[in-house]
Amino acid sequence: MTSYLWFLLAAVFEIAGCYAFWMWLRLDRSAWWIAPGLLSLVLFALILTRVEASFAGRAYAAYGGVYIVASLAWLALIEKTRPMLSDWLGAALCLAGAAIILFAPRLHTS
């Protein structure tokens, strides 16, 4: 269960870090946005190592579903744009895939 919390926290920092660069490069905001963006992305990387997984690639793949849902929440809460039904349907499919990756029985460790 703690992996979900780490995934969610990682998503917040990754999205915030990327959004800081979006602010600078796409919305013509100050280059000072780079500093919090870099800090946020470093925290994202550190936090993602806390996930209970034997292999990095599997952790990243499972995290992808959480990232997509968190991105849609960011769209709604920060950018004040309502996600469309197709956004939520796509996110649901991705979460299903992430759940399969996360919960599938492991017959082999490689």
UniProtKB/Swiss-Prot annotation:
Does Manganese appear among the keywords? no
Q: What UniProt keywords are attached to this protein's entry?
A: Cell inner membrane, Cell membrane, Membrane, Transmembrane, Transmembrane helix
Membrane topology type: Multi-pass membrane protein
Task: Extract the InterPro entries matched here.
Answer: UPF0060
Say if the entry is tagged with keyword Hydrolase.
no
Where in or outside the cell it occurs: the entry states: Cell inner membrane
Q: Which Pfam families match?
A: UPF0060
Which SUPFAM superfamilies does this one have?
Multidrug resistance efflux transporter EmrE
- Gene Ontology CC terms, in alphabetical order: plasma membrane
List the transmembrane segments.
5-25, 31-51, 59-79, 84-104
What family is it from? Belongs to the UPF0060 family.
The name of this protein is UPF0060 membrane protein Pmen_1247
